[in-house]
């Protein structure tokens, strides 16, 4: 018999496996990505102090036209990078959140790189 694969559970397991290795420090914080069906969210987190330093999402007013599509994801990546550079952060560790590095997640990463963040 075939079992139906629970995509959310497998993503959560993947994320936990990746999070064992990916850790954000004050010098090099973690860029975390969350992708919902309609929107995309990114935040830069210092795991040592358990503080979110910078956050951006496709729900912000300036992204109302694109939403969570690829173009919107690229703009969110650029916005989070711009806010991070204003706070003096230039290097981050990329946490794809258990998602495949493809599509919207990839566009967010490329947008952040083009805006000046180093992974």
UniProtKB/Swiss-Prot annotation:
Domain of life: Bacteria
GO cellular component: cytosolic large ribosomal subunit
Pfam families: Ribosomal_L18p
GO terms, molecular function: 5S rRNA binding; structural constituent of ribosome
Matches recorded under SUPFAM superfamilies: Translational machinery components
Keywords linked to the UniProt accession: Ribonucleoprotein, Ribosomal protein, RNA-binding, rRNA-binding
Family statement: Belongs to the universal ribosomal protein uL18 family.
Function: This is one of the proteins that bind and probably mediate the attachment of the 5S RNA into the large ribosomal subunit, where it forms part of the central protuberance.
Quaternary structure and partners: Part of the 50S ribosomal subunit; part of the 5S rRNA/L5/L18/L25 subcomplex. Contacts the 5S and 23S rRNAs.
Family annotation (NCBIfam families): L18_bact
Protein name: Large ribosomal subunit protein uL18
Organism this protein belongs to: Clostridium botulinum (strain Alaska E43 / Type E3)
């Amino acid at each position: 018999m075939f079992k139906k694969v629970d995509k959310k559970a497998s993503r959560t397991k993947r994320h936990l496996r990746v999070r064992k290795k990916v850790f954000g420090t004050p010098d090099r914080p973690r860029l975390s990505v969350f992708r919902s069906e309609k929107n995309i969210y990114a935040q830069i987190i210092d795991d040592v102090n358990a503080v979110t330093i910078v956050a951006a999402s496709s729900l912000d007013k300036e992204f109302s036209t694109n939403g969570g599509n690829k173009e919107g994801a690229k703009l969110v990546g650029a916005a989070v990078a711009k806010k991070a550079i204003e706070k003096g952060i230039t290097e981050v560790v990329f946490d794809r959140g258990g998602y495949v590095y493809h599509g919207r997640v990839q566009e967010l990463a490329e947008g952040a790189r083009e805006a000046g963040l180093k992974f």
